[in-house]
Amino acid sequence: ILWETSGHLDHYSENMYPPINHDENNETYYLKPMNCPFHILVYKSDLHSYKELPLRYFEFGSVYRYEKTGVLHGLLRLRGFTQDDAHIFCSTDQINDEVKTLLSFSVKLLGSYGLTEIEADLSTKPNKYIGSDNDWDNATNSLKQSLTELKVPFQTAEGEGAFYGPKIDLHAKDAIGRRWQLSTIQIDFAQPDNFDIEYVNSDNKKSRPVMIHRALLGSVERFTAVLLEHYAGNLPGWLSPIQIDVLTIGNVNDYAQTIIDDLKSYRVNLDDRNIRLGEKLHNSEKSKTPIQIIIGEKDASSNTMAVNIFGKENMKDVDYKKAINSIKKLSLIHISEPTRQIVI
C-alpha cells in the first residue's frame, strides 16, 4: 500500500480518514492526506541523470485530513483543502541554491498580495531523526543562510523539526498585527529512502536525491481567509472577484452595454433588475465590490455617470470618458499601494 511505503499509516494515521473497502474488487482505498507520494511515483516512472536535477513537480492538489471537530475553523482549518504543492528532487550540493530560490519566491509572492511583514521559524534536528548528522547540518545551514541573505527575520525552534528533515515556516502579519503561518519549505531525507528513488551521478553510479517539499500559499483556502482578514473583506481592485458593478435605473441597457464594452478587460457585473437602487447598492456593498457605476436615463442622454469608489467620496455627473479612463487606472493599481486612489 502506498501509504505504508510512505510511512503515513505508521506516523500520520490519526490524521487520515479510515480506509474505504471496496468489496467488489477486494481493494482498500484511502483519501490522500498529502500529495508527495504521487510526485515520487512520477519521479520513479523514469530513469534520471544528474543533468536533469533539480527536477521540480508542481500541482494544485486536493488533500483530506481528519481534523478534530474542535480545531476546525472556517476556511482557516478544514478537513479538505487544496495545496499549491511542489516537490523538488535535487542533489545535496544543490540544496542551498534551491532553498534560496524558494524562499525568495515565497517572500515575493506574499508581498505581491500585500503581506509584507514576514517572519520565519527555523525548525531544527529533533532527538529522533533519520539521515546523517552531516546531512542535517548542511541542510539546516542552507536554510539559515538563505534566511540571513534574504534578510528574513527568524527564530530557531531547536529540536522541533520533523524526524525526516529541517524546515522553514513563514509567518505573515496582517493589518492589525496578527501572525499567520503560510509558506513551508521542508527538506526530506526519509521519502527518497522509503521509495528507493535514485539518479545516475556524474561517475555513472546511482545516488540518492534529496527531496524538498514546498507550499507557498499553505493552502488556497487558508490563504484566501488570511487575505480576507488582512483587508477586512475589501480586497484590492485587481484581486476582487467582481471589480465593477454597473447599476441601472430605468431602461438604459444600451448605455450600460457601451460602458461594459469599454471595460471588457475587467470583471464587470451588470445589475439591471427591476428593483430599487438602494437594494442594488446594498447588494454590491455587501459583496465588497470596490467600484459601482450608477446610470439612469439622464446619464444616458448627457453621456455621464455616477461613480462610487471604496474609500472615496461618491461622485455624480462625471464625464463618461474621464470616468472610464480613471477607472482603468484604478484597476491597475498594485496591491502594495496603501489605498485605492482615483482622480476624476
Model-identified regions with their sequence ranges:
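NTP/phosphate- and nucleic-acid-binding module
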Residues: I1-L332, S336, R340
